[in-house]
């Protein structure tokens, strides 16, 4: 065992003749008179973490104080057991680590001190696109295209695997990181050097929360925070409020786990749970499998919570057995949980900040859309919902039902037609009940003579190879294939915007007539412009409903009451729960999990054949458009003085719910964008632009892509969509990138104003890195989403909120104002009040109060050093 803290609380736990040391949280709680059974289970995990990680008695008393008011403003240090990454966020993180080694060398330190101290698993899942679909060889073609496009990135990751300790890469074509984590990587109870403790993690993807369904505490963080955690830095956090959700009853009728999570998302987003833990409890747990729970936990970012936690119970053990975990590990989980009061007790209810109740029997079949995951719509209201939303897309009522011919085809399309139907995302493909349900519905549809409409692009991209194995074993895969839901890849695909191109004739018809067409997907996000640039409307739903909408080909139908085919209704082809359960019982077993995960780190022949150079520091290629040495450390060693921001210009003014997709898009690179110009200047053809997400290892592309989402709306440019602003130095409309570069060249700082929920969505650290490289010094908003706020701080950008009832609208800003932010100094504290002086061109001046949204002393240190990366490197140098 390495460092030993609070040794008086260490005791022995024997499991199958193996002795483990554990930190006795019952004794520690008793010593400070903390009634442990009243504490939420998620906080019990944190209590053990603080105890084990050198927490003083004062640190532990924070939990006792929490029980008095069910909230706290006290800080704790969280030390996760491990880190999970995917390639879109993982590549820039490893680029940062490589750059840190160079920086360490530059200031006279040892580059090898930059090494992960805890296990880091990176799963390559974000790069495969749906180029080929509805064909037997679609999977092979898409894999080949993926390798061709991403060979340089993959060589870099393979280099990282040999250069850094504790760093493993799961090669492409294996699965989605969260499903791989759920089915294989997660241990529930970790053990190292003879010490057993709760498994926990942070991940560079916001849906890291999925594993809370398996009772593993974890959440998404920005890449820069993850890097700090890897290098042994604690994640300082405020002990959160915990919202308890009491579940009763069970799902009935045709309601699925997807319908349940959309209901939970709607309910909790209204409750405003940002920055809070959510914990599920109650008799209803007995009616939810781990797969159901994981679906609910997966969408924690969509309902705004840090995590959605389920305590350990018998379902946890059943799932570990089903997925082929070692018997000794399963026994350790069961014994440890019972010994430490982490096993769910149905007889004793923990105490929560607030309790909400949800009767599972009240959940209805539904979709969510057309542009936010919290906007749930009952299935029989979808058509009306879409028509109600059409004016918001600029479509007049008289044009709603118009149809337009598609060139060289014998069909027409119109507003509301579904052009993408994708069974995608770990949210749902990890759940056998909805996957088997989709396959059974496909079977029955074919038996009734139904076919997918010819304008619908269909795809199946599960999160693990186990899914295709049980579909094959059940004999149901052929029905999905026949409807066009052939395997296209094992990765995120459509859910993250890698939906690939539509039929060119369909694209032409959409563009020519300004159609609002739709995608229906089993994903977790449907933000504007995310799924495909041409599908302005996107609806989330279960895989079963994805198949149903592919058959109908339109949103303009009440599937509950209108026929899909001639005298054929959805109820005629919907599989019963008994049918689904029978297939699951006969087709899913532990041996398939063991087999499919036995060589998870091996990869394909193409992966094995990738050539790399063995070295401890990376040999940067200055001509690369994928991997570049970032400029963050050019001023390493110099002091970053915190001082007032004077004579700043407004770079942009945004409304509510600006997502990290808006700030730093992951999808395709528009041919007219600044990033496209950079790539073209570097002799890259448009066909090879790839996506923003794939080029996150190159800061030149990413800073040009910042605020370049084609659907973003800057209120300074009325009636204009896309990444534009008014450059106040020239009084001209320019791209945000070009204006920012002009301001930087003239030493003019810039700020951003925004509404509520700024930075919601993905854990995208480039949504903070990009603005920092554009010269943004502060973001002033009504509220921030949790991960993005910490990312801004990590990059040295000040997050500030209005006080009272002030908003950007009350201030009547037009973007021509000059901004001073007064009250910033080396003595700033968390939640520091500051003054904002707004000077209009007329000479009128107004001063308002702002609150600095910096929560901890550690975050103050990050600002003082210029960024969390500077802080870590300079601390490690010693």
From Swiss-Prot:
Q: Where do the annotations place [4Fe-4S] cluster binding? A: 426, 492, 495
Question: Which catalysed reactions does the entry list for this protein?
Answer: citrate = D-threo-isocitrate; (2S,3R)-3-hydroxybutane-1,2,3-tricarboxylate = 2-methyl-cis-aconitate + H2O
Provide the assembly information: Monomer.
PROSITE patterns tied to this protein:
ACONITASE_1 (PS00450), ACONITASE_2 (PS01244)
Task: Write the protein's name.
Answer: Aconitate hydratase A
E.C. designation(s): 4.2.1.3, 4.2.1.99
Tell me the cofactors it needs.
Answer: [4Fe-4S] cluster
Please give the pathway this protein is involved in: Carbohydrate metabolism; tricarboxylic acid cycle; isocitrate from oxaloacetate: step 2/2; Organic acid metabolism; propanoate degradation
Q: Which gene encodes it?
A: acnA
GO biological processes: propionate metabolic process, methylcitrate cycle; tricarboxylic acid cycle
Keywords assigned by UniProt?
A: 4Fe-4S, Iron, Iron-sulfur, Lyase, Metal-binding, RNA-binding, Tricarboxylic acid cycle
Task: State the source organism's domain of life.
Answer: Bacteria
Originating species? Rickettsia felis (strain ATCC VR-1525 / URRWXCal2) (Rickettsia azadi)
Note on cofactor: Binds 1 [4Fe-4S] cluster per subunit.
Molecular function terms from GO: 2-methylisocitrate dehydratase activity; 4 iron, 4 sulfur cluster binding; aconitate hydratase activity; metal ion binding; mRNA 3'-UTR binding; mRNA binding
């Amino acid at each position: 065992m390495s460092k030993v803290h609070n040794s008086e609380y260490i005791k022995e736990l024997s499991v199958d003749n193996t002795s483990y040391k554990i930190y006795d949280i019952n004794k520690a709680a008793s010593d400070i008179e903390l009634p442990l059974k009243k504490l939420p289970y998620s906080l019990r995990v944190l209590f053990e973490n603080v105890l084990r990680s050198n927490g003083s008695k004062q640190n532990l008393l924070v939990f006792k104080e929490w029980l008095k008011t069910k909230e706290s403003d006290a800080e704790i240090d969280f030390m996760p057991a491990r880190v999970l990454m995917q390639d879109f966020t993982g590549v820039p993180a490893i680029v940062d680590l490589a750059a840190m080694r160079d920086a360490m060398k530059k200031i006279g330190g040892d580059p090898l001190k930059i090494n992960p101290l805890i296990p880091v698993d990176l799963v390559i899942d974000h790069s495969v696109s749906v180029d080929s679909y509805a064909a037997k060889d679609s999977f092979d073609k898409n894999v080949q295209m993926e390798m061709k496009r991403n060979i340089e990135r993959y060589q870099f990751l393979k280099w990282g695997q040999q250069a850094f300790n504790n760093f493993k890469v799961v090669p492409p074509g294996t699965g989605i990181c969260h499903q791989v984590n759920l089915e294989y990587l997660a241990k529930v109870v970790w053990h190292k050097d003879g010490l057993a403790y709760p498994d926990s993690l942070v991940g560079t993807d916001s849906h890291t929360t999925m594993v809370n369904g398996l009772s593993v505490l974890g959440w998404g963080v920005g890449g820069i925070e993850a890097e700090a955690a890897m290098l042994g830095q604690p994640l300082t956090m405020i002990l959160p409020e915990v919202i308890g959700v009491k579940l009763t009853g069970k799902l009935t009728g045709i309601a699925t786990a997807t319908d349940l999570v959309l209901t939970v998302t709607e309910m909790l987003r209204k409750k405003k749970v940002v920055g809070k833990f959510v914990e599920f409890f109650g008799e209803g747990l007995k009616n939810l499998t781990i797969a159901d729970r994981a679906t609910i936990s997966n969408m924690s970012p969509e309902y705004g919570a840090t995590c959605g936690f389920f305590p350990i119970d018998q379902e946890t053990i059943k799932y570990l057995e089903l997925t082929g975990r070692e018997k000794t590990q399963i026994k350790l989980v069961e014994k440890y949980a019972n010994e430490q009061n982490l096993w769910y007790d149905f007889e004793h209810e923990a105490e929560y900040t607030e309790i909400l109740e949800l009767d599972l029997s009240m959940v209805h079949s539904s979709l969510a859309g057309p542009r936010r995951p919290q906007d749930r719509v009952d299935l029989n209201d979808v058509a009306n919902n879409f028509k109600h939303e059409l004016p918001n897309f600029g479509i007049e009522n008289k044009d709603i039902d118009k149809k337009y011919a598609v060139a060289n085809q014998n069909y027409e399309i119109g507003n509301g037609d579904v052009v993408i139907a994708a069974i995608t995302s770990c949210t749902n493909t990890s759940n056998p009940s909805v996957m088997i349900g989709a396959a059974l519905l496909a079977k029955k549809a074919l038996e009734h003579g139904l076919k997918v409409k010819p304008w619908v692009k269909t795809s199946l991209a599960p999160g693990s190879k186990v899914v295709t194995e049980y579909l094959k074993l059940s004999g149901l895969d052929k029905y999905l294939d026949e409807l066009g839901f052939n395997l296209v890849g094992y990765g995120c695909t459509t859910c993250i915007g890698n939906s690939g191109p539509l039929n060119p004739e369909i694209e032409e018809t959409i563009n020519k007539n300004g159609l609002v067409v739709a995608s229906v997907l089993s994903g977790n996000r449907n933000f504007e412009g995310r799924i495909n640039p041409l599908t302005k409307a996107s609806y989330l739903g279960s895989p079963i409903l994805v198949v149903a909408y592919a058959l109908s080909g339109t949103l303009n139908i009440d599937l509950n009451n209108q026929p899909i085919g001639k005298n054929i209704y959805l109820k005629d082809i919907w599989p019963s729960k008994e049918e689904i359960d029978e297939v699951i019982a006969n087709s899913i077993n532990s041996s398939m999990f063991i087999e499919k995960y036995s060589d998870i780190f091996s990869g394909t022949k193409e992966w094995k054949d990738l050539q790399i150079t063995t070295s401890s520091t990376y040999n940067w290629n200055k001509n690369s458009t994928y991997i570049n040495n970032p400029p963050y450390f050019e001023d390493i060693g110099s002091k970053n003085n915190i001082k007032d921001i004077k004579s700043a210009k407004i770079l942009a003014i945004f409304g509510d719910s600006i997502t990290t997709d808006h700030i730093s898009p992951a999808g395709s690179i528009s041919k007219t964008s600044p990033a496209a110009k950079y790539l073209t200047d570097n002799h890259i053809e448009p066909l090879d632009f790839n996506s923003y997400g794939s080029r996150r290892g190159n800061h030149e592309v990413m800073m040009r892509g910042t605020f370049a989402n084609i659907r973003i709306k800057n209120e300074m440019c009325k009636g204009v969509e896309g990444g534009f602003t008014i450059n106040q130095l020239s009084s001209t409309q320019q791209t945000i990138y070009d204006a920012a570069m002009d301001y930087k060249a003239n030493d003019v700082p810039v700020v951003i104003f925004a509404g509520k929920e700024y930075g919601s969505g993905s854990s995208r650290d480039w949504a903070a890195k990009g603005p920092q490289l554009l010269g943004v010094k502060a973001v002033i908003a009504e509220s921030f989403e949790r991960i993005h706020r910490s990312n801004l701080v990590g990059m040295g950008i000040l997050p500030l909120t209005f006080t009272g009832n002030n908003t950007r609208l009350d201030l009547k800003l037009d973007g021509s104002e000059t901004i001073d932010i007064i009250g910033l100094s080396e003595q700033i504290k968390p939640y520091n009040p500051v003054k904002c002086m707004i000077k209009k061109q007329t000479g009128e001046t107004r001063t308002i109060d702002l609150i600095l949204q910096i929560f901890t002393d550690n975050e103050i240190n990050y600002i003082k050093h210029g960024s969390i990366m500077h802080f870590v490197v300079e601390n490690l140098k010693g």
